[in-house]
């Protein structure tokens, strides 16, 4: 099979142009990455931590406050592209302590209210800037 034959069999998503998304309402990135990249009808959002977009600082507070700020940061990216949490098809939650799962889940359920995305939750040794939670999502246009 030639390369052209293989390309013809790929879904359009994999042949689409990569577009960098830089939402105006998002906090500055804390490293060499973009907050979101669109490829075809998919939007890949980088992991968001509880940074206040106004001052670039990690917010103070418990896991519920941190999760709320994280999801507000995710919402800013989705809003920028005309999407909502209903468009999210996959999320990955990173927690520094799985004992915080219930608190995170309580706030998460306020944003994802129906047609839930697939989700993974992973405990990690640490997150940037000392955050307790980070969430990344993939959304569909």
Regions found by a protein language model. Name each.
Residues 8-10:
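Short, low-complexity intrinsically disordered segments enriched in A/P/G/S/L with frequent Arg
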Residues 14-141:
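Short, polar/acidic, helix-capping and beta-turn segments at strand->helix junctions
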